[in-house]
């Protein structure tokens, strides 16, 4: 297994660890909550960095593999979806935004399956990357700033996170629409 694929697998392993710390941050004292939110944020940030590094190293060193093409987006989806689920339970992300994110991911997966059947290669587009970066930055903002905020700042952090989540929802909807439009020929060719 090459280094980019090891980084992808590291991200897969970090997902349940992130989920544990995000879940236990709901219990205990304010200090306990802040500490576990910060740990969850650090884990998420490390996992996000591996997302950048695995793709960069794979392309730079000509180490792109079918395994990486499959596992990298799957690891990303697991990581960001888990974080948004916890943000919904913290009432800083609307379930509508989560539904938009999930719908887009299922739609894109469907398009990729159609593409695989026809032997079509679909390149990632800029809008998908913008969406991913915005989602990851929003999640990192919530976990880091939320953990470090004082009692008087909680309202601002919650409000800012809600606004950022709606921007994520809009970016997700836009990137999904563009992706589906760019690949509409696959639907026409489907039997």
Where are these regions (language model features)?
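Alpha-helical transmembrane bundles and membrane-interface segments of multipass inner-membrane proteins
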Residues: 1-191
């Amino acid at each position: 297994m090459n280094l980019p694929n090891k980084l992808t697998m590291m991200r897969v392993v970090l997902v349940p660890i992130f989920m544990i710390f995000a879940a236990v941050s709901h219990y205990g004292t304010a200090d306990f909550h802040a500490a576990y939110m910060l740990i969850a944020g650090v884990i998420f940030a490390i996992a996000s960095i591996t997302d950048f590094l695995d793709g960069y190293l794979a392309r730079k060193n000509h180490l792109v593999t079918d395994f990486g093409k499959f596992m990298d987006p799957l690891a990303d989806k697991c990581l960001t979806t888990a974080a948004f689920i916890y943000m919904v339970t913290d009432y800083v992300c609307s379930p509508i935004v989560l539904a938009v994110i999930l719908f887009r991911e299922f739609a894109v997966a469907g398009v990729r399956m159609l593409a695989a059947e026809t032997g079509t290669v679909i390149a990632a587009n800029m809008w998908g990357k913008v969406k991913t970066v915005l989602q990851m930055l929003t999640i990192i903002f919530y976990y880091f700033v939320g953990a470090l905020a004082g009692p008087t700042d909680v309202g601002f952090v919650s409000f800012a996170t809600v606004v950022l989540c709606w921007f994520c929802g809009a970016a997700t909807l836009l990137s999904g629409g563009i992706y589906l439009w760019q690949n509409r020929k696959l639907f026409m060719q489907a039997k």
